[in-house]
Amino acid sequence: MKDNNLSYSNHTSEAGHWYDQDGTPKYTIVGANGVERNTTLRDAKKFNYVPSVTSVLDILAKPSLEHWKLNQALKASMSMQRSEGESLESFMYRCIQDSKEIGLTAAREGTKIHAMIEQGFVDQTSSEPYDAIIEYLDTNYPDQKWIAEGSFCSELGYGGKIDLYSEEGIFVDFKTKDNIRDKEPSKLVYDEYGMQLSAYAQGCGFVDKAERVSIFVDRQEVGYISCYKWEDDTHSKHRDMFNSLLSYWKLVKNYDPSRQA
């Protein structure tokens, strides 16, 4: 397990990321031309890197996300004006690009919020999301030694960077969403979130039992959180779902970096 990265500028989602067999992040690599670039599957095969948990999960279909993207594109088409003489293809392209910017803005806000939370666990720097989260954790899981942004590599051939976990096997993941105040926590979660936490737990040696918590932070009201504790009996289900997906990922990519291979 590797120490956390404290730099906000380097605080990025682990999606599309790679790790070496010691759990060290290998998000970028210096190419033959001496220029640093993003690590590719070809690089991973050469150096025996493993994919991140979210890279594996990314091959899943995400109907809710695709529906959200479609809605954003439709909203853009209703709010934007088509220029005189502009082709339909050009207008559609502008609408799609505008809707993508909405998603990028949301992602940037999420990254900023994650960084504030991480900094709080590193040096107790106060912020609205951190203060709300630590109050919840101290109440429900007292006397824990929390580790923020620790990375790992599993012998099964995957790795990851965990938002927060304790040495006793409590795994916490932070998500940012809009307008969550009037929604039940159970309405905010998907099996994918449970799979992510179970994969982290398994990768850290908690194969059969782990406490898993998804904490949602409102992007517009960052001091408001909604917390969902996963049922214990769903851990084995989500673990097996992830492992099945991992096997599929290896077949699709024609690459198995596991130490059991």
Where are these regions (language model features)?
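Acidic, carboxylate-rich catalytic segments that either coordinate divalent cations
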Residues: 261
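Metal-dependent nuclease catalytic cores that hydrolyze phosphodiester bonds in DNA/RNA
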Residues: 1-159
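Mg2+/Mn2+-dependent nuclease catalytic core
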Residues: 146-257
